[in-house]
UniProtKB/Swiss-Prot annotation:
EC number: 3.1.21.4
Domain of life (superkingdom): Bacteria
Protein name: Type II restriction enzyme ScrFI
Keyword Hydrolase (UniProt): yes
Pfam families in the cross-refs: RE_LlaMI
Gene label: scrFIR
Additional facts recorded: The ScrFI restriction system has two different methylases.
Family annotation (InterPro entries): Restrct_endonuc_II_LlaMI
């Protein structure tokens, strides 16, 4: 066993095992509160550099939602930010144009006073058009792209929502660079860099809980390569779970897989 894994097992046994997280007073959604508590027990601070959390391993919290996140990875290009169509979105700032994008390609939430979001049903699955005229594809260069096609848009009021310049097919609305950034340093890292910086060092680990919510085991999984990951996107096992909504400048671009898949990657557990 490598010494880094041994050290993580030691930390788990001394700081985590047998404990039920005290998440009172934490102003974060439920799974996030548990995740932050666990990070603190392992001595992990806020990690903005997109590298593995600790000792070459990425920590993944056992989410009660039934799905676990690879990362919050926004697209490198959005239609409301980049030419030739960005001028069609009202607003003088990026966040205002993002709001306009949500109104054009998203849906209103009546429970939120009609606030529009690009999340849920407007977000396409891989290789399938949805009723909002959107489809996600993987291109030959391994970029992931969401296209909009007016002919596939089933909304009754699409002529009112979509400007004439966008009333045709296969319009790119979001693009993630797969393995190469054609603009070099501009518009961020590729998906390959983001994934492998976190998951292709020594691997990843998670901590599981027993029936009363106390942590009982630490489990490890092998490193994950971009080649494996993009194949999982292709098959629909990994999916894009957007949380973009009107009034919030953060795009919330989560890439996830169900917990059952993560569990299948576990190679060894320790109590």
């Amino acid at each position: 066993m490598n010494p880094n894994k041994e050290r993580l097992i030691e930390i788990f046994r001394s700081n985590v095992k047998g404990r039920i997280p005290d998440i009172s007073g934490r102003n974060i959604r439920h799974d996030g509160r548990w995740g932050h508590w666990l990070e603190e027990r392992f001595g992990i601070s806020a990690n903005a550099d997109n590298h593995a959390d600790i000792l070459g391993y990425e920590l993944k919290n056992e989410a009660t939602s039934g799905k676990t996140t690879f990362g919050d990875w926004s697209a490198n290009e959005y239609i409301f930010k980049t030419p030739p169509y960005n001028s069609l979105f009202s607003g003088s700032t990026a966040s205002e144009k993002q709001n306009a994008f949500c109104r054009m390609f998203g849906k209103p939430n009546e429970a939120k006073n009609g606030r529009f979001s690009w999340s849920g049903s407007p977000i396409p699955k891989i290789w399938q058009y949805n009723s909002f005229g959107q489809i996600m594809v993987i291109e030959e260069n391994l970029d992931i792209v969401i296209y909009y096609s007016f002919s596939q848009d089933l909304r009754y009021n699409k002529f009112e929502i979509i400007p004439p310049q966008l009333q045709h097919d296969e319009i790119q609305i979001a693009r993630w660079y797969g393995v190469a950034n054609p603009l070099l340093s501009r518009r961020g890292k590729t998906l390959k860099d983001k994934l492998e910086d976190k998951f292709n060092d020594l691997g990843w680990f998670t901590c599981t809980t027993d029936s009363i919510g106390a942590y009982d085991k630490i489990c490890f999984g092998r490193p994950i390569t971009f080649e494996n990951w993009i194949n999982l996107v292709d098959s629909g096992i990994v999916y894009f779970d957007s949380g973009m909504y009107e009034g919030n400048k953060r795009p919330y671009s989560q890439w996830r897989a169900d917990n059952s898949y993560w569990n299948s990657l576990i190679t060894d557990c320790h109590q």
